């Protein structure tokens, strides 16, 4: 009798589990695509759904960026469905996004964007989103390292290097400043005019502000024919093709609309890095943002503390961007390390 009860319990448990999983996957599939009742197609769909389930499992950090209903201000701005990287599957821009993007640097007679993107993905892998494919840890900790002079004598280097991802931007040298800025870089955000040579294992994230930026990256790893945009740019770069990622133009507009509320002409690389990291990381720490303790705005590699022309260009609203990051820190979505 006891054996029969155990067997019955096992059968019931199996049936409940089977019904639950079947219901879950069918409902999930229905939200994505219409279900096709061919065995091979079903297996593929179940496999893809299982991958998505694993990728998007709950964060295990103490404070998880994506957690909602903790701040109305944050919930109004953060859109988890936005895709930060351009791929062959999501490359079609809506008309209003395309028109807005074209105005950023007022490019004269740009080439056809669709043709440019097709050529881009003949050279750069564009069939998957590498950042999301790598999402295999319960708590991904990321350091976003800005270029502020407040990093000098901060001794943040080892702390920065302890993160899973370390994002840097533009010129950002590390040689000679290792104790303060660290040695590790996993992703480096650049545009053609700010490019610097990267380490072999560093992923380059190109931030395109105009069509020629996309053409440049193709040229720079193939023919080397583009050596000038509005200023001279490197004709050739040494970056592995599978290490080249493209920041999505629609994501730039999302940052501008949702987070900057239209302040400035367009977002700085700094705030683009911050919001990008919030969408691919579970925990984000900022280093090298803002002025130093004396109120000076300068780069950590500059010997002139009073420098800060980059803040006075009128292109970016540095004060508003600073307020955004300060607010994010105040509601425990990110942490800011202010250095010296």
Swiss-Prot record:
**Which residues of the sequence carry a binding annotation for substrate?**
105, 147, 170, 230, 266, 270, 290, 299, 316
Q: Which GO terms describe its biological process?
A: ganglioside biosynthetic process via lactosylceramide; keratan sulfate proteoglycan biosynthetic process; memory B cell differentiation; N-acetylneuraminate metabolic process; negative regulation of activated CD8-positive, alpha-beta T cell apoptotic process; O-glycan processing; protein glycosylation; protein modification process
List the disulfide bonds in this chain.
59-64, 61-139, 142-281
The residue spans the entry assigns to the Cytoplasmic side of the membrane are as follows: 1-13
UniProt keywords (A-Z) are: Disulfide bond, Glycoprotein, Glycosyltransferase, Golgi apparatus, Lipid metabolism, Membrane, Secreted, Signal-anchor, Transferase, Transmembrane, Transmembrane helix
Q: EC number(s) in its UniProt entry?
A: 2.4.3.4, 2.4.3.2
Q: What class of enzyme is it?
A: transferase
Where, subcellularly, is it found? Answer: Golgi apparatus, Golgi stack membrane; Golgi apparatus, trans-Golgi network membrane; Secreted
* Membrane topology (UniProt): Single-pass type II membrane protein
What GO CC annotations are associated with the protein? extracellular exosome; Golgi medial cisterna membrane; Golgi membrane; Golgi trans cisterna membrane; membrane; trans-Golgi network membrane
Record note on modification = The soluble form derives from the membrane form by proteolytic processing.
Q: Does the keyword Cell inner membrane apply?
A: no
The portions of this protein that span the membrane are: 14-34
User: Which pathway does it take part in?
Assistant: Protein modification; protein glycosylation; Glycolipid biosynthesis
A single GO molecular-function term is: beta-D-galactosyl-(1->3)-N-acetyl-beta-D-galactosaminide alpha-2,3- sialyltransferase
Outcome of mutating residue 191 to A = Drastic decrease of the catalytic efficiency for both donor and acceptor substrates by 44- and 115-fold, respectively
| Pfam short name (any one) | Glyco_transf_29
UniProt family annotation: Belongs to the glycosyltransferase 29 family.
Q: What name is this protein filed under?
A: CMP-N-acetylneuraminate-beta-galactosamide-alpha-2,3-sialyltransferase 1
């Amino acid at each position: 009798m006891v054996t029969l009860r155990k067997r019955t319990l096992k059968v019931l448990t199996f049936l409940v589990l089977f019904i639950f999983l079947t219901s879950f996957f069918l409902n999930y599939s229905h939200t994505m695509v219409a279900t096709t009742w061919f065995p091979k197609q079903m297996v593929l769909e179940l496999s893809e759904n299982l991958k998505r389930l694993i990728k998007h499992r709950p964060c295990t950090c103490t404070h998880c960026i994506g957690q909602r209903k903790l701040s109305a201000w944050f919930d109004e701005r953060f859109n988890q469905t936005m895709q930060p990287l351009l791929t062959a599957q999501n490359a079609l821009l809506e008309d209003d996004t395309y028109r807005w993007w074209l105005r950023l640097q007022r490019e004269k007679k740009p080439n056809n964007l669709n043709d440019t993107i097709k050529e881009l993905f003949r050279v750069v892998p564009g069939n998957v989103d590498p950042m999301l494919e790598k999402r295999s840890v319960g708590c991904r900790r990321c350091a976003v390292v800005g270029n502020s002079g407040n990093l000098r004598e901060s001794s943040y280097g080892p702390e920065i290097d302890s993160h899973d991802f370390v994002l840097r931007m533009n010129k950002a040298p590390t040689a000679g400043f290792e104790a303060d800025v660290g040695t590790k870089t996993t992703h480096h955000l650049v545009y053609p005019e700010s490019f610097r040579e990267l380490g072999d294992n560093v992923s380059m994230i190109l931030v395109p502000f105009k069509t020629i930026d996309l053409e440049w990256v193709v040229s720079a790893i193939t023919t080397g024919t583009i050596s000038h945009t509005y200023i001279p740019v490197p004709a050739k770069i040494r970056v592995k093709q599978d290490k080249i990622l493209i920041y999505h133009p629609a994501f730039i507009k999302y940052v501008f609309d949702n987070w900057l509320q239209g302040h400035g002409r367009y977002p700085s690389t700094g705030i683009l890095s911050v919001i990008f990291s919030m969408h691919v990381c579970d925990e984000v720490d900022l280093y090298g943002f803002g002025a130093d303790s004396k109120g000076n705005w300068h780069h950590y590699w500059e010997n002139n503390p009073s420098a800060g022309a980059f803040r006075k260009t009128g292109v970016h609203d540095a004060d508003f961007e600073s307020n955004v990051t300060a607010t994010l820190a105040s509601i425990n979505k990110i942490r800011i390390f202010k250095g010296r």
